[in-house]
């Protein structure tokens, strides 16, 4: 692959980092003499190599960036701030290094990293400590920030961030516990019903956790929604199905005292934690909540790992898409998630507890059990033991930290965020149990899921509350799930401490989640309890402080029933009794809460009516954007319309509304584009994605909501990365069937800048010249200089060709910048690279500072990762070029992945043949055809066009 690869044998046990550090504005930072000696060396060796930096201005704090020359078995980094002579570690978890970035932890890949210190000032001194998988550390020379010119990628730094920011770390864990449930039903309503709902004015009610919600008439009006004059006609939908609600009165007009209540359910998918409910003012009576508890003959509604696509094509169609609506446990705003749920699995009173203590169950592999687990965790609710009067029930609590992004693990559509790193330092974390029933028969069950990091035999030793449970053994990137039987007497009422320790040196793994199922007393916790009962069981719930208890039966969450429980006073407060249900039913899912307890939605938004599904639609060019950038697309739309194209500018929220029930997911965009391509009266010829994307759509890292227009994260050969072409790859050959271009902007100012370059671009302003840059091929199997010789042979004779070869040009860096500033029609780079650098010749900071004004080239990059635009903290070269304020490029073609040069070169030769053919060709058409010249599926999927696919450069 055209990235800096170094022999594993030569690099074993060797790690060196050349570090760039950034503050709000940029400068070269010099080591602070003697500081390390004053502070102490730690257990590692201080690096004597100078640290170079380009630093940027943010609204508050210091933005630190550094780059490594190469890495071998690098676990990662710690970053320290030196304040008042004290060294303070800023990161709660190691900042993941090369072992998390590639399949081979000793492959020598150079990497880029960053951290945002909101408490930093120009006086703060920083130290970077590298840590290898054997626990050896090296503290690099300390640096003090200086100020330079601002950068576009820092324009949108959040003014208030709860957690530190780092390239692949999600920040500190928040240890708040909360009770949740996730019974999202399998049944999905008619897509026609959903299309009818979103084609009219509606109030979108956003729900992040399960609970009893209230929306008032003043809240409706404040969001811009007119609820109409008849409260009885308010109708609520989610997933295309009507939901029963309770209103403040049955019929008549609404006033400021009126409200609507309903049982809402949150969401937990890799892309979203927010479910959407749609409230409309209908012309008929809406579905209302009944007042009696009931049982259901189908008590286990659950959503499996994948759902069918929201629309279907005739059987003769080749394409049938699956909408991957991964419904898991709903999350709150905390990164650390301690989940409490109950289990439908009725425990046998005759179960025997293991007298010897914990008994491990054999591990399961993640691939073989991922689908099952996703379904299982939806229906593991409270269950009472088989008796007429339930003495206790089975409750499950889960802890799932999301701290580390592991891009090298190839696990399909499962998210690549994990928890604590288990390496040379043991990991301690707690999991909270409420009111364990110590007299219960049978053991508790502890389920642990791990993820291997490096390719060795792993052994992780597990202990609970100081008692060893056993070991989990696995290999490489396996994802074992292992269960231990634990005596209930070993649990504590409150925080239970888990310890994870590596079994041998160099063994590195990550905790995915921990789930503990235990017998729990039928006692309210903070005046509430979520539980399940079999229909033949009754129960008494103790521990309430108020007699006014609302009992909600949400067995069918679309048709919940509510009653006021009969409460009897006792010595501890109040207790309620639940009678037996229908003997023909299996179980009831119940929630007991005070009548005064209501939840507030996460947000209220006015739905903008849309009808993208109609086959009467048509457009040559689609511009899909975020609502904050829609207005900025107008100049580009006007330009193309003036050239005879029909243009449609589409809010991505409308796509979610129509194709994923309002849920944020990239699958909805593909489903929409497939429908447009196959049913619209005029199918689209080009697609522009106006807005950035992020590998962190859930904002675990606290960087901000940056997934404006999502990209698809695919498993390539070496890592997970972005593929925009996936959105229109309808035949699964790796390349787009409709040309796609990305403008990865985050602000209106960035959008105006990038679009103005396209709108004002004229081939007449650009010299008929090409700059071909080649990396030093010495020691590598592929000759980059010869590759550029072949490129040059494909260019017409009237194009002046300039060459910069790093191997023979000692001033290669300066000459690349000078030639770019002079203006070029075409720039081609062939060589090694990383996200923000061409090996030794050019980087993102250089790109931002270019001054070629309107003499803008098309830049083609044949290396690795320059198109890795979906990193929330780093700006790659491709996006830096098109966002450069005083020049840069009008478009760029670069890869988001790791690939080898052969397939790249085949594609680039075909691209130049097309671009300089007898007739001008649109960039998107040229790219689409050029990808057919390579059989390398990774090259096809990961090369991204940054620009307008409908434009031509000559």
Language-model features: where?
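Cysteine-dependent hydrolase recognition
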Residues: 155-954
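N-terminal secretory signal peptides that target proteins for export/translocation
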Residues: 1-13
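Low-complexity, Ser/Thr/Pro-rich intrinsically disordered linker/stalk segments at domain junctions
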Residues: 37-177, 700
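Generic alpha-helix initiation/capping and coil-helix boundary signal
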Residues: 10-15, 20, 919, 923, ...
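Generic N-terminal simple sequence motifs
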Residues: 11, 27-29, 46, 92, ...
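Sec/Tat signal peptide C-region and signal peptidase I cleavage site
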Residues: 32-35
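Bacterial N-terminal signal peptides
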Residues: 17-30
